[in-house]
């Protein structure tokens, strides 16, 4: 989780941009960088996961172009090797460093090539224009709006755009923006063919895809931890991850000191798979005192979202 922002014109001062961008500093506490592209500003708050050294800091730049990306590019090593064979060199181990060379080679067709969850803003120096894109499912957040002069502005969270844009809208998943238009490059709901496999084959395929999906998300330079509630979803993820690991994975669970049903079942799962397990206890007082902070971070007063996020916030804070 990082934070990105792009102001696609010179109608904003550096100080005003920085003030708006600072509202999501919590998404990327490790480092911050803002650059002027000549046609606008790009900002990046970093939470280092891949390529932990300073060379992995964004925005990445190439021949005057620049990009900021909040995302994970799966299988980037294979793409990197192909680009190296074409003569490109890389300075870091960051998965996102491949994006500018990839764009230079394939343009907006690159988005269909990515196995990734991402939101990005790219400045194309050759065309002196901005491009933005979001993954097909919309896993990574991205919002946009227009300032009073009609210039488009992109950001990871809506709160970055408050006071700049009169109307703030979610960037459509599976689309890229270029030349004033939003173009769908992949519709996740589109049915290309109807499957008639028997139940056994379907179950086998689901199992294989689940394992593959978990395995590719274990690739990181930073330590990987797992939130375990004891429910079906988190228990399956942790069990598969433990099978893929040659040492105990780190699992974390949270609950109240009384009637902690999640803690009970999480411990049963942790004991069964052999993880290194940590229990975090929260009190009613902690929940109440954290309420305003959680609402501010979420940017919503939706009761269901707030209730579901409270335990997540407190366990992540403890970690």
What are these regions (language model features)?
Residues 49-68, 117-121, 163-170, 212, ...:
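Acidic loop->beta-strand submotif enriched in PP2C/PPM serine/threonine phosphatases
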Residues 8-16, 85, 105, 126-131, ...:
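ATP-dependent adenylate-handling active sites, centered on carboxylate activation for C-N bond formation
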Residues 34, 59-60, 90, 114, ...:
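Short clusters of hydrophobic/aromatic residues that line enzyme substrate/ligand-binding pockets
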Residues 41-46, 66-70, 132-133:
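Active-site-proximal beta-strand elements of phosphoester/diester hydrolases
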Residues 3-10, 17-29, 66, 76-97, ...:
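N-terminal segments that mediate ammonia production and transfer
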Residues 43-54, 136:
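Short Ser/Thr-interspersed hydrophobic loop/turn segments at strand-loop and sheet-helix junctions
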Residues 28, 71, 99, 177, ...:
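Residue-level signal for inorganic ion chemistry
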Residues 93-127, 136, 314:
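Catalytic core of PPM/PP2C metal-dependent serine/threonine phosphatase domains
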């Amino acid at each position: 989780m990082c934070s990105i922002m792009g102001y696609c014109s010179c109608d904003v001062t550096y100080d005003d941009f920085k003030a708006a961008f600072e509202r999501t500093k919590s998404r990327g506490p490790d480092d911050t960088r803002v650059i002027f592209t000549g046609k606008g500003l790009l900002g990046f708050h970093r939470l280092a996961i891949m390529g932990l050294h300073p060379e992995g800091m964004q925005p990445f730049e190439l021949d005057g172009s620049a990009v900021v990306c909040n995302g994970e590019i799966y299988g980037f090593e294979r793409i990197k090797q192909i680009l190296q064979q074409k003569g490109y060199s890389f300075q870091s181990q960051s998965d996102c460093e491949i994006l500018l060379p990839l764009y230079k080679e394939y343009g907006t067709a690159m988005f269909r090539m990515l196995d990734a969850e991402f939101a990005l803003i790219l400045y194309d120096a050759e065309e002196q224009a901005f491009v933005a894109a979001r993954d097909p499912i919309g896993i990574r957040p991205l919002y946009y709006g227009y300032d009073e002069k009609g210039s488009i502005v992109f950001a990871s969270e809506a709160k970055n755009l408050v006071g700049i844009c009169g109307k703030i809208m979610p960037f459509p998943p599976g689309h890229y923006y270029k030349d004033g238009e939003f173009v769908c490059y992949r519709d996740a709901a589109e049915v290309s063919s109807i499957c008639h496999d028997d139940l056994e084959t379907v179950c086998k395929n689901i199992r294989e895809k689940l394992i593959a999906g978990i395995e590719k998300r274990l690739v990181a330079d930073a330590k990987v931890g797992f939130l375990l509630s004891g429910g079906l979803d988190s228990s399956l993820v942790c069990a598969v991850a433990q099978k893929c690991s040659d040492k105990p994975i780190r699992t974390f669970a949270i609950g109240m000191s009384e009637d902690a049903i999640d803690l009970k079942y999480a411990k049963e799962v942790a004991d069964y798979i052999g993880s290194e397990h940590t229990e975090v206890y929260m009190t009613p007082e902690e929940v109440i005192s954290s309420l305003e902070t959680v609402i501010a971070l979420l940017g919503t007063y939706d009761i269901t979202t707030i209730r579901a996020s409270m335990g997540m916030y407190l366990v992540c804070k403890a970690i």
